[in-house]
Amino acid sequence: MAIGITACVLSLINYQGLAYSAALINEPIQACVIAREVDLTDDIRTKFAQCLGWQADQSSPVCLGFYKPIAVTPLASPDEVRILADTASFYRTQRSTLSGHVEMQQGQRVVNAQTAYVYRDPKTNEVTKIEFLNHVRYLEPDRMMIARKAVVYPQDKSGEVEDVLYRFNTNRSNALLPAWGRASLIKRFANQDYFLKEATYTTCAPQDKAWAIEAESISIDNEKGKGIARNAKLRIHEWPVLYTPYLSFPTNRDRKSGFLMPIVGYSNVGGADLGIPYYWNMAPNYDMTLVPHLYTKRGLMLGGQFRYLTSKSTGTFNGNFLPKDKAFGRFLQDNEVEFPQIRGLSTNRWEVNFVDSTQFLSDLQLNVNFQQVSDDYYLQDFSTNLASVTQRQLLRQADLTYTTENWTFRGMGQSYQTLHPINEIPVSPVYERLPQLMARGYYDDLPFNAQFNILGQYDQFHWPNDSWNIALNNMPQGPRFHLNPILSVPMMKPWGYVTPSVQFVENYYDISRNYTWGTSRANYNLTIPRYSLDGGLYFERDLHLKGTYYIQTLEPRLFYLRVPYYNQTLIPVYDSGFMIFNVDQLFRTNRFSGFDRIGDANQLSYALTTRWLEDESGAEKANFSIGQIKYFSERRVQLCQSPTGFCTDNPDTFGNLSSTFGTSPVASRAVYKFNPAWGITGDYIWDPATRATNNADLNLHYQPARNAIINGGYSYLVNGDVTQVRNNDTENNALHQAILSAAWPLSEKWSGIGAYSYNISKNYSMMSFLGVQYDSCCWAMRILGGRIFRSLNEEFEPQYNNNIYLQILLKGLGSVASSDPSGILNTYIPGYYDPFRRR
């Protein structure tokens, strides 16, 4: 009897399990085929675990087990069909029957069953369909299906199975285990996409009831790397908690379009919050996320983020818009009589933020940073970060930089939006630079090892119109030209160095002031030389400490600076200010920031630094520095500006030091690493003029494991408090704050997270949150309660934004969150490991 099956080899042999190891499934296949409508009991789940190849392993603390791999040895030809069976009956004009340990293999696809029927095209005699019954097991790379019935179409490699228990190994973004579930029908298409009817889907272990999707249908698109569930219910521990007609989820690590999990939450300033994010994967190099939010106290906000990445550019655009904010409208109505400056403000709230970096050529780069909000209270109402809530200056800047071997050229435009919340001392606006043109040259190959630096900069300063303080609208403005050439001759030896340097600073101003009666103009030209001599020595010795060999260095340094005095109080202050004194300021050539004030100097800085370096690796174990400046004359240049040419700086101004005392504060710094997990850094500055601390900070970091962190910080700065209000007095105007933050495992799966910041000088907390986090094999959860300092009320009592964060991550599916607190956690817990960001 002729078989006549094209590209098909039929063999009658005793079953040996040639293409698949039967050890993967310990229970008979029949026990795995259970009708879809039958509820999953613990016994059934145990059977399913065995059927799917689950191997319990208590040494795996998270998942408590693993799946045995699906191994298929492919045939030499992907089109070859090989069938094995105990017995077979073949016919030309009717279906052929195979019985007993049937195994069919085509390429990398293997199907096992007790019975199979082979159908052929009567004209071509080619196999068109093979039907499998009883104890069906369908295998492909990373795919396993156990079913009552299966049909395979060898021509296009499609197929379908009925009453299925399946396991799909897909490369999901953060799931630790493959997906598994049941379906009444699974269709496998020629392009290797799948359609599941009346199906369940989960990435939990078979005996874990944590979560599952139950859907009318699930479509899996392998090329796009996504799954779509329709008419789906999310079950948590078998209880239905959410219904959605459409749910999209990833099946690999690629980005894909679709709705994300809903956002739910509550805050005292916005009320209940419901959001439906939609992610649009527009192209491989740019995407967009749209997030409509419904706030019960405010209204409907539409937010979005657009990201792009090209061969030359990378950037992000963020925007939010909330029309007719109900809560803000009530705020305006309640306060416009007492504070008329807020009268007429729109209740439409919005924010835009744009960041871009474009590399046109290897030596030509454009950077843009732009942020603007609708009103002075937007950040207070919508930000969850203390740094943003208390921010009062929003940068808007674009610069174009061209770099050569010896020169850098830059053109820049810069301005700020200044926020003026009521009940605060008004923050002075910042001058606009429209434009700034800069050229900087550097040559280090001159004769006698000399180095030459030159900086030329042109700034056109504009004073922004400020409706909050009309008196400031006649502020000086106009162009400034700054030139600063520097010639130095470093003389270096292994044991030390000496570097003499000479330079001069030239500033030219063309100043105008606008008055009601007209405009006044004035010109100033200032040329000031600077002379300095910098020298230091290097000593080192071997050090043996607790079984480890170190090299200890001792580095004394002297720095003499001479700058003659020139009265500069007639010149406006565009960008200069006092600086916080620390070790770094010991060796600066100007005690003021910016270019508008050139500090006079006749002084000698002296400092001593010691380092401990590991002998083998060279890693720094410790670094201690201490230093001071000896003044040989009083400092006469003042920061203040006066049309008379005479003024005196306010001694309580932020960063101001005594101009008559013979020495500077003593500055010290320490960095010490006890071990790779534990380190401490700190600065302490003692001012002998006031016999008190000028500023200090101390930071501790302990991280013995990736998910175990403790941070502590303390800051003190005279006149540095950032929460100034109208009734402040000098005594409590120091920045005096402490912060403690931690993320610590409580067990294999549970951890605690929290942070607390306290304003010691004003006696109230600035920020606090506390929560717990659970991270298991197939899901993670964290709940945090916290508050962020917002402002002070009319009685100067602190007001807070109170938030509750609830975030649930279903690994392999997505997250449900009140709002993602990852930014807060990463800000206040440096080094924090976030399981919700696992990739």
UniProtKB/Swiss-Prot annotation:
InterPro entries: LipoPS_assembly_LptD (IPR020889), LptD (IPR050218), LptD_C (IPR007543), OstA-like_N (IPR005653). It holds the Pfam family LptD_N. GO terms for biological process: Gram-negative-bacterium-type cell outer membrane assembly; lipopolysaccharide transport. The keyword Cell wall biogenesis/degradation does not apply. It is found in: Cell outer membrane. Residues 1-21 form the signal peptide. GO terms for cellular component: cell outer membrane; transporter complex. Together with LptE, is involved in the assembly of lipopolysaccharide (LPS) at the surface of the outer membrane. Belongs to the LptD family. Component of the lipopolysaccharide transport and assembly complex. Interacts with LptE and LptA. PANTHER family: LPS-ASSEMBLY PROTEIN, LPS-ASSEMBLY PROTEIN LPTD. This is LPS-assembly protein LptD. It comes from Legionella pneumophila subsp. pneumophila (strain Philadelphia 1 / ATCC 33152 / DSM 7513).
